[in-house]
Curated annotation (Swiss-Prot):
UniProt key word Repressor: no
Name under which the protein is recorded: CD320 antigen
Organism of derivation: Homo sapiens (Human)
Positions contributing to Ca(2+) 2 binding: W150, D153, H155, D157, D163, E164
One Pfam family this sequence matches: Ldl_recept_a
Extracellular-facing ranges: 36-229
Classification via PANTHER family: CD320 ANTIGEN (PTHR24270:SF52), LOW-DENSITY LIPOPROTEIN RECEPTOR-RELATED (PTHR24270)
Position of the signal peptide: 1-35
GO terms, biological process: B cell costimulation; cobalamin transport; positive regulation of B cell proliferation; regulation of vitamin metabolic process
Gene name of the encoded protein: CD320
Its membrane topology: Single-pass type I membrane protein
Main location: membrane
Positions of region (Disordered): 199-223
Length: 282
C-alpha cells in the first residue's frame, strides 16, 4: 500500500516538474516576442527610402538611399549605383566669357578637348585666351607664354618650336605678338661674305715645292725603315712550317703503328737512345 502511494507521489512530482518547465518555456518565448515585434511593410518602405533623410550637404541616391557629397553631383562620375547623381545635369556650351555652366565659376579649359556639349571649345571658338604679359611671346599652337628674349635663341622653348621659326627674316608671327627683325642685307655684306668664303692663303712657287719635298721625304723614311709586316709574315711562315712538320711526324708514327698506348713514349726513348749512340760513336 505504501509502495503504490509512493509511486503516485513520484508521478505527480514528475508531472508538476514538466508543467513548470513548459510554463517557463512559454514565458521566455513571450518575452522574446515582446522584445522584437514583427515589422510589417508600410507604404513608405515599399516605395523606397524617404527623401530628405540626407543632410543639405549630401545628395541621396534614388534607389539605395545612399548619401554622397553634393560636390559629386553632376561631376561625370557615377557615384550612385543607379546613376541618379548624374541625371538631369544641365551642360551648355562655353560662353564668350569662358564659363561652362553648371557649375558656375569654372573656366572653359580651352585645351583642344571637347569638354562641353557641342564641342565649342575643341576649336577654341568660344573660349577666351588670356593675354601674355608685357615682354612675353605667345606660342603659335598653344597658350604658353615665353619671354621675348627666348625668341630665336637657338633653343625651341614652345611645344611647337614656333619661337624658332622665321629667325633672321622680317617675318611677322601669325599671332602678331612680336616681329623679328634680322640684320639688313647690303652689297658690302654680301661682298665681304663672298671674299671670306672664296679667298684663301696665296699660292706661291715656294709653297708648292715645300709640299712636294715633305711628301717625298716622308715616303723615303717609310721605304728606308724596315716594316713590321715582314717580321709578322716570317713568323707566320715559320709557325706554319712547324705545324706541318709535326703533323707529318704524327702521320708517319701512326703508319708505323707506333702511336699506341705508351707507343709514343717508347718511340721517343728509342730516338733518344739512337741519338746518344750516334754521339758516342767516334
Amino acid at each position: 500500500m505504501s509502495g503504490g502511494w509512493m509511486a503516485q507521489v513520484g508521478a505527480w512530482r514528475t508531472g508538476a516538474l514538466g508543467l513548470a518547465l513548459l510554463l517557463l518555456l512559454g514565458l521566455g518565448l513571450g518575452l522574446e516576442a515582446a522584445a522584437s515585434p514583427l515589422s510589417t511593410p508600410t507604404s513608405a518602405q515599399a516605395a523606397g527610402p524617404s527623401s530628405g533623410s540626407c543632410p543639405p550637404t549630401k545628395f541621396q541616391c534614388r534607389t539605395s538611399g545612399l548619401c554622397v557629397p553634393l560636390t559629386w553631383r553632376c561631376d561625370r562620375d557615377l557615384d550612385c549605383s543607379d546613376g541618379s547623381d548624374e541625371e538631369e545635369c544641365r551642360i551648355e556650351p562655353c560662353t564668350q566669357k569662358g564659363q561652362c555652366p553648371p557649375p558656375p565659376g569654372l573656366p572653359c579649359p580651352c585645351t583642344g578637348v571637347s569638354d562641353c556639349s557641342g564641342g565649342t571649345d575643341k576649336k577654341l571658338r568660344n573660349c577666351s585666351r588670356l593675354a601674355c604679359l608685357a615682354g612675353e611671346l605667345r606660342c603659335t599652337l598653344s597658350d604658353d607664354c615665353i619671354p621675348l628674349t627666348w625668341r630665336c635663341d637657338g633653343h625651341p622653348d614652345c611645344p611647337d618650336s614656333s619661337d624658332e621659326l622665321g629667325c633672321g627674316t622680317n617675318e611677322i608671327l601669325p599671332e602678331g605678338d612680336a616681329t623679328t627683325m634680322g640684320p639688313p642685307v647690303t652689297l658690302e655684306s654680301v661682298t665681304s661674305l663672298r671674299n671670306a668664303t672664296t679667298m684663301g692663303p696665296p699660292v706661291t712657287l715656294e709653297s708648292v715645292p715645300s709640299v712636294g719635298n715633305a711628301t717625298s721625304s716622308s715616303a723615303g723614311d717609310q721605304s728606308g725603315s724596315p716594316t713590321a709586316y715582314g717580321v709578322i709574315a716570317a713568323a707566320a711562315v715559320l709557325s706554319a712550317s712547324l705545324v706541318t712538320a709535326t703533323l707529318l711526324l704524327l702521320s708517319w708514327l701512326r703508319a708505323q703503328e707506333r702511336l699506341r698506348p705508351l707507343g709514343l713514349l717508347v718511340a721517343m726513348k728509342e730516338s733518344l737512345l739512337l741519338s746518344e749512340q750516334k754521339t758516342s760513336l767516334p
